[in-house]
Amino acid sequence: CLSSRNFGTKIVLWRSGRVGYTWKFGKGVNERLNSSNLYRFLEPITCWEADVDFEPKWLAWEITRRCNLNCVHCRSSSALEVEGHPDFSHEEAIRILDDIASYAQPVVVLSGGEPLLREDVFDIAAYGREKGLRMCLATNGTLVTPEVCSRIKEAGIKMVSLSLDGSSSAVHDDFRSQPGAFDGTINAARLFKENSIPFLINSSFTKRNQEEIHKVYRLAKELGATAWYMFMIVPTGRGEEIMAELISPEDYEELLAWHYQMEKEEDELLVRPTCAPHYYRVVLQKAKEDGEKFERRSLQFSTGGAKGCLAGQLIALIDVDENVLPCSYFPKSAGNLREQSFKEIWENSPLFLDLRDYKKYKGACGACEYVGVCGGCRARAYAVTGDYLGQEPFCGHVPFKLAQSGK
């Protein structure tokens, strides 16, 4: 709804859900304005997320760094044998769950590495469920069996995510550095469907497989996934070794535009670009071009955010060493659960407080009218520039302020 209008100064304040916008009227306003055509006549000045409660809504939890695959993009450089990062004990897992549950009730995704390599993974999930946490599981799928499906259901796991990076074994297995990985993922999807276990598919893309995006999307639908997340690589961990394979900013923009059109027409599969916060800018820009208001659907066990980068704002990662990180791709600790409570870290970490203060953002991101609904990928800025408050390096948008000033 329109919360305020002042046509004399040509300023409009707009509020839609949790997101607010400040716009000015562009040229050619010559018809009666209403909520359906307003977008076509406005030029953005700034966007913000209104009434934000910085509560932890979604936590990834690296319960092991061990993995049976050797993926080229792995954020944690996982391997079957990992030196210096042993699994924490079951007792420590219980302590962490008690700590989290005493403060919040987020979605908790048991991740890795490959979480199915931990013998107590289902005991951890069941305990988390008993504490009122919504437990999910992220697996590469290669270790899924009928018995695993039974254990998933018994533990009360709400959602499982699978990794699928190509529409064929040639592409996926190359990305995962393991022959047979594709067949394992497809088999896992089949077993989940047979056992009525809801699952989503995560797909990571670089130059080596970006031509597969449309095919993987269609395959995710065919497999019966609940949702499909298109991940744009953040070069951390082993991903640093494939920096030259990152999708170019120009191709990135084209893919986000394609995703917008696809999402508008998609009424079966929930879809979302991930680690692509500027998609929220693209949605607003395209909606304005189309002269329509685009309402996006949300997955029940998603991050719960109405904006782009949520690192340290609504989401976080707890790694196997009990460090609390802003997100899965942001290798900078905000604190350690062996030294502080989760509540203390979440509320008082200087790192998290920085990420929540958009006025501290630098470069084009700091000047951008979309900073409040995009924010740029803070992990990518940190990985590429070394400054987590720096400019998103893979966004080509020229902010309104900079365009007006000619800088």
Identify the residue ranges that each predicted region occupies.
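N-terminal pre-core extensions flanking Radical SAM catalytic domains
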Residues: 4-84, 98-101, 295, 342
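Radical SAM/AdoMet-radical enzyme domain recognition
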Residues: 90-111, 117-240, 245-248
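Short, acidic, Ser/Thr-enriched surface-loop or helix-capping motifs
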Residues: 318-319
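Flexible mid-to-C-terminal extensions adjoining Fe-S/redox cofactors in radical SAM and related proteins
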Residues: 21, 29, 40-55, 323-324, ...
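C-terminal accessory region of radical SAM enzymes
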Residues: 196, 249-298, 323-375
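A structural motif corresponding to the C-terminal lobe/cap of the Radical SAM core domain
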Residues: 221-222, 226, 241-268, 305, ...
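Cysteine-centered iron-sulfur cluster-binding motifs in ferredoxin-type domains/subunits
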Residues: 62-70, 114, 365-372
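Short, small/polar residue-rich loop motifs at catalytic or cofactor-binding pockets
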Residues: 309-313
